Amino acid sequence: TGDVIDFIHILGSVLDLGVPSDSTVSLAKLTATGTKDATTFLRGDNSFAVPSGGKIGQVLQSHKIDQFSTTNGIGGTGFTDITGLSQAITPSATSSKILIIANIYISSSGTGSRQYYRIEKGGTAIGLPSAMSSGTAVFGSNYNWHSTTSTVMMSLVYLDSPSTTSATTYNISTTHNGNDGDATVRINFQANSGNGVNDDNGTSNITLMEVLA
């Protein structure tokens, strides 16, 4: 008990026990249970398994480098789509989720005004708060309290379940509360001019990631 056989003599000759050389053992020779192929991996309990969910299937991005502005307020026609901040994606399975990440470089020319932002899918706002007795349902907002020269990067993040394999378009829309006579929402440039040596211009983007089930 506990002894190890190093070799065996048969009629005066050493019997080779057949220790396999490197990289010569096939999957079929392994005792592990489960399906053995390129889609599985060997676990510590000697079984093959399919990797769990959470894999990223595809990543798409729309990067907006030009300027955009709108004077549309909630007292007017409401929300306006920000040109260039939209991206389409075609999910590979109905069980997939879409992670939406939007970074918007914003400013407003109206001191004391508030800008509102929404994420839309196919033209319909998503991720909004539950029913409200008053007020405006938004995904994100910014209050321009300082001056017409203030800028900020607004980030919107949402995990959507489109339940489709058809092409789906997501976009960002904006409006303002109209508290200032010149409450213009500006995207990618500073409100006062955006062209001086001390004025800052920026870029915005919307990124879509398909998260596989």
Tell what function each PLM region has.
Residues 23, 35, 55, 80-82, ...:
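Short, surface-exposed loop/turn motifs at beta-strand boundaries within globular domains
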Residues 71-78, 88-97, 101-167, 171-213:
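Terminal beta-strand-rich extracellular "head" domains
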Residues 2-69, 213:
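Glycine-rich, low-complexity segments
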Residues 56-57, 81-84, 126-128:
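Local beta-strand/beta-hairpin segments that build beta-sheet-rich folds
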Residues 47, 76, 81:
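Short, flexible micro-motifs
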Residues 14, 26, 32, 84, ...:
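Generic preference for well-ordered secondary structure
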